[in-house]
Amino acid sequence: MIVCIDIGNSHIFGGVFVGDQIKHNFRYPSTTPCTSDTLGIFLLSFFERKKLDIEDIEAVVLSSVVLHLEYSVNSACKKYLGITPLELKPGVKTGLKLDIKNPLDLGADRVANSVAAISLFPSRNIIVVDFGTATTICAISENKTYIGGAILPGINLSMESLSQKTAKLSNVTISHPSSALGKTTISQIQSGLIYGQLGAIKEIINRISQENFIDKPPILIATGGYAHIFEKEQYFDVIISDLLLHGLRIIWQMNK
């Protein structure tokens, strides 16, 4: 078994691989108090519920965009699973070339997404949209080079901003609206959140494609916690909610 873990702004998201397939996954809120012990006990409980033997774990691979949680997760894996994780940091082999001004600023999550995308669609131009706390857009050229991207507020972040900065607008269930024309305040917020996000993404992707991929249109991949909401739009070529974890598994294979 290979355990792949991503420390995100909202959740610690993990998957247990057997071969190249995720057999089990877990989420732990990264906004709650997280010590090595609380996380370690959570992991042991998860493996016990799934009837998995921690002795069968061959490796743990870790990516993070939340610096202050890295120590706790790392320590939990060492103390409770008996394994020192491979952390996706500079110096780890990825097979990904970077054509950006500050390579060290690129988030580990975006590196892992890009690696997985290249594995799925070698020799193709690719754009990956990750619907997380922030929505990130990554452009990868056909020669396995990350050439840049865009970042915008995620759907939940946009909703929280509305509820916190306005007097009469509250949080709503994030779901695909039945119509762009809302008949209630709730449905109007949902329309604005979903179609506003989709419209922004389409415009950014269109401009990136015109500027960089005019001769070979890119494959469009959606991933992240809110990717499934856009399924019925049939805009993306493929939706893979756990793309990042697959990228971590591939990176482990390159470095073992």
Swiss-Prot record:
The protein's predominant localisation is cytoplasm
Q: What is this protein called?
A: Type III pantothenate kinase 1
**What residues bind substrate, as annotated?**
107-110, 185
Q: What is the name of the gene encoding this protein?
A: coaX1
Origin, by domain of life? Bacteria
GO MF entries? ATP binding; metal ion binding; pantothenate kinase activity
Give the cofactor note: A monovalent cation. Ammonium or potassium.
User: Which residues of this UniProt protein bind K(+)?
Assistant: 130
